[in-house]
Amino acid sequence: MVSRQEQFEQVQAVKKSINTASEEVKNQALLAMADHLVAATEEILAANALDMAAAKGKISDVMLDRLYLDADRIEAMARGIREVVALPDPIGEVLETSQLENGLVITKKRVAMGVIGIIYESRPNVTSDAAALTLKSGNAVVLRSGKDAYQTTHAIVTALKKGLETTTIHPNVIQLVEDTSRESSYAMMKAKGYLDLLIPRGGAGLINAVVENAIVPVIETGTGIVHVYVDKDADEDKALSIINNAKTSRPSVCNAMEVLLVHENKAASILPRLDQMLVAERKEAGLEPIQFRLDSKASQFVSGQAAETQDFDTEFLDYVLAVKVVSSLEEAVSHIESHSTHHSDAIVTENAEAAAYFTDQVDSAAVYVNASTRFTDGGQFGLGCEMGISTQKLHARGPMGLKELTSYKYVVTGDGQIRE
């Protein structure tokens, strides 16, 4: 096993080769990575079977689905890499140019960060997405996956590096930390001078540990306590469709709805319909029904478990939904501000003034009017695959694509000027 220190030194030794690589060279490397990923399908699936067998019974079915790979999912991962090829290269982009009275020309140019560390949990697709985005944005990457997905991740990284071996980019620009202990995560948090940026992707425990302990600069990809508010002026059919999609299309992801707020004028009519759609109809279709966590008012209209205080502060990532009835738009916004992780929140309303108030007052990375929160995604936003959803305000906010993985520098051109 290569030591962490050796890996940090290896990636530092080759980072310049990717930091300054041309768009053509990077695109050739990405295509080779995608091709070798598909070519290694058999090996990746064998590794994934080992991870699945070890994880079964230890994590939920929803989380198992995150871990699971088949040939179609591997092809989708390769397709995601190829989509990055089509995106404009951000490196070298001139952001601003100005000329001073003394003749100095100041140009602000986009540049690579350098080496980016990614600590993430059991999601194999993050491996290929992270490798593709960091490479296209001119960065080397150090990956540290969760223990549950290590065999799969190792097989994926092996395939990606074999692809790079056929190009002029050194394979060491992608590094996988082989030690999955907590110590390896903490070592990355303290790797100042080796990592220029650290991005955690996972649950609240992982993210909080990185934010609280890292001395390396961090972009926080927050958890998603995502709200949908059904206003008194909502179209109920539209609301039900949005709720169904936001909660059930993929409950294990961070942009899935966790809390439903319903105006008291709508509760008596929409909550029984919601119960029919999310419980009865799903049971009839052989699908897992939604389990409700209800406040006292919501429980008058639908059956379910009484909500505890913590239910409105929980990212369930499962077929569980907290429901609260509110008396006004203002109460809904106040609740969101008290409980939201500032990821994605939505209002369903036909009232333009209510929509404007909601979008002005709710301080989240993505705020929706009459649309599912499931659109908070780099691909859906036209950014290509993403590095994560940033819930902080400095440097990057919302889906992080290529530009969010860059910095800038000033190039000052003169003709012998000196400062007097």
UniProtKB/Swiss-Prot annotation:
The keyword Signal does not apply. It is found in: Cytoplasm. InterPro entries: Ald_DH/histidinol_DH (IPR016161), Ald_DH_C (IPR016163), Ald_DH_N (IPR016162), Aldehyde_DH_dom (IPR015590), G-glutamylP_reductase_CS (IPR020593), Glu-5-SA_DH (IPR012134), GPR_dom (IPR000965). GO terms for molecular function: glutamate-5-semialdehyde dehydrogenase activity; NADP binding. GO terms for cellular component: cytoplasm. It comes from the Bacteria. GO terms for biological process: L-proline biosynthetic process. Keywords: Amino-acid biosynthesis, Cytoplasm, NADP, Oxidoreductase, Proline biosynthesis. CDD domains: ALDH_F18-19_ProA-GPR (cd07079). Its EC number is 1.2.1.41. Pathway: Amino-acid biosynthesis; L-proline biosynthesis; L-glutamate 5-semialdehyde from L-glutamate: step 2/2. Disulfide bonds: none annotated. It is an enzyme of class 1 (oxidoreductase). It catalyses: L-glutamate 5-semialdehyde + phosphate + NADP(+) = L-glutamyl 5-phosphate + NADPH + H(+). Belongs to the gamma-glutamyl phosphate reductase family. Catalyzes the NADPH-dependent reduction of L-glutamate 5-phosphate into L-glutamate 5-semialdehyde and phosphate. The product spontaneously undergoes cyclization to form 1-pyrroline-5-carboxylate. This is Gamma-glutamyl phosphate reductase.
